[in-house]
Amino acid sequence: MEMKNIFVALFISAVLVSSVSAATMESPAPSPGASSASTVAFPVVGSIVAASLSAFLALLLQ
């Protein structure tokens, strides 16, 4: 049972990391004009959410 919990936690962490890395892939160049800081901060917020969810899941499965 312990190995199953570890496997599930690692699997979900890997899924979260891959989803965050997919969100940070190259995008087309921004158009000239007003730029938004939220587009720059989105990958950071995504990685924080993924780390928080994986930590919660690890505590839940402990």
UniProtKB/Swiss-Prot annotation:
Cysteine pairs forming cystine bridges in this chain are none
Q: Which InterPro entries match?
A: AGP23/40
- Please list the residues that carry the modification 4-hydroxyproline: 28, 30, 32
> What is one GO cellular-component annotation here?
side of membrane
Keywords (A to Z) from UniProt: Cell membrane, Glycoprotein, GPI-anchor, Hydroxylation, Lipoprotein, Membrane, Proteoglycan, Signal
The glycosylation sites are: 28, 30, 32
- Signal sequence extent: 1-22
Report membrane topology. Lipid-anchor; GPI-anchor
Say where the lipid (GPI-anchor amidated serine) is covalently attached. Answer: 35
Q: Does the keyword Signal apply?
A: yes
Coiled-coil intervals in this record? none
Membrane-spanning residues where? none
**Main subcellular location of this protein, as a coarse class:** membrane
- Residues cleaved off as propeptide: 36-62
Modification after translation is described as:
Contains 4-hydroxyproline; hydroxylated on Pro-28, Pro-30 and Pro-32.
- Inducing or repressing factors: Up-regulated by AHL16/TEK.
Location within or outside the cell: Cell membrane
Function per UniProt: Proteoglycan that seems to be implicated in diverse developmental roles such as differentiation, cell-cell recognition, embryogenesis and programmed cell death.
Record-stated family: Belongs to the AG-peptide AGP family.
Per its record, how is this protein called by name? Arabinogalactan protein 40
Q: Origin organism of this chain?
A: Arabidopsis thaliana (Mouse-ear cress)
Q: Which gene encodes it?
A: AGP40
